[in-house]
Amino acid sequence: MANTPLIVSFGEMLIDFVPDTSGVSLAESTGFLKAPGGAPANVACAITKLGGKSAFIGKFGDDEFGHMLVNILKKNGVNSEGVCFDTNARTALAFVTLKKDGEREFMFYRNPSADMLLKESELNKDLIKKAKIFHYGSISLISEPCRTAHMAAMKTAKDAGVLLSYDPNVRLPLWPSTEAAIEGIKSIWNEADIIKVSDDEVTFLTRGDAEKDDVVLSLMHDKLKLLIVTDGEKGCRYYTKKFKGRVPGYAVKAVDTTGAGDSFVGAFLVSLGKDGSILDDEGKLKEALAFANACGAVCTTQKGAIPALPTPADAQKLMKSKSK
């Protein structure tokens, strides 16, 4: 692992409470299963499961859930030198409704939760400087002091020549308003080297038809090396300054879509960490995205995010069985 490039993931990790029966509302559910969640943490775990090297930077409540989550990171091989604890705030919780098609709705308990209270002075900047890729979302932009810490972490990475990877991961209930969400998510848009958005997020951010190239291309900026749009089981689209195209997905029986996007991102970042030239080589890029599509698909076949994250063998098995 000595020569394996480090990918640092920044943001939130929380407990998801998932109904033990899918297709029922939170009120109707008779029981809940607790599962670790939070997109940046899922990405960090996806990376190590696929043989990469990752670290997580974030803040937890000094409570049983917080220590449980950090132990899960450690058990998954994620470097936890960037985590800290808050004695005065709780670890965030989310109640997740699983609809019949495996899609989700969220109800959050975090006012404020420890992850929102991360201060710039608590950042492990040395860890960020060691990374090849620095990955983050937008939830850490919602409130202070975490927003300032997030901006400082990005600047540290950029100044050190680290690639910036952004998955906005829109969670509208956490923002004060729709307008605040769009403004906040776009406030750091032009800093990223790589951005991954879902088709729904394209529609949300542009108010346009996500299927149309000109709508997607309105999200490109001068410094952006790659824009990826995920289209669920249909696969994904990619846009660079030189080329654009689509990579088909893998049809599987989806049980729970939680973590599928994070599994996709983790898989792509592992490929990019190994070979930066994939941003300029369309053939290599398509291979990396096909592998990422397979990882995302495998993740939907089991409940929970981190427990469902695939190994390379899981993804390759699916790719072989569905080779077109």
From Swiss-Prot:
Pfam assignment, any one: PfkB
This enzyme's EC code(s): 2.7.1.4
Gene Ontology, cellular component aspect: cytosol
Top-level taxon in the UniProt lineage: Eukaryota
UniProt xrefs under Gene3D superfamilies: 3.40.1190.20
Keywords: ATP-binding, Carbohydrate metabolism, Kinase, Nucleotide-binding, Transferase
Pathway annotation from the record: Glycan biosynthesis; starch biosynthesis
Any GO BP annotation: fructose metabolic process
Cited InterPro entries: Carboh/pur_kinase_PfkB_CS, PfkB_Carbo_kinase, PfkB_dom, Ribo/fructo_kinase, Ribokinase-like
Catalytic activity: D-fructose + ATP = D-fructose 6-phosphate + ADP + H(+)
Ranges annotated as spanning the membrane: none
GO MF term list: ATP binding; fructokinase activity
Described purpose of this protein according to its UniProt entry: May play an important role in maintaining the flux of carbon towards starch formation.
Family note: Belongs to the carbohydrate kinase PfkB family.
Protein name: Probable fructokinase-5
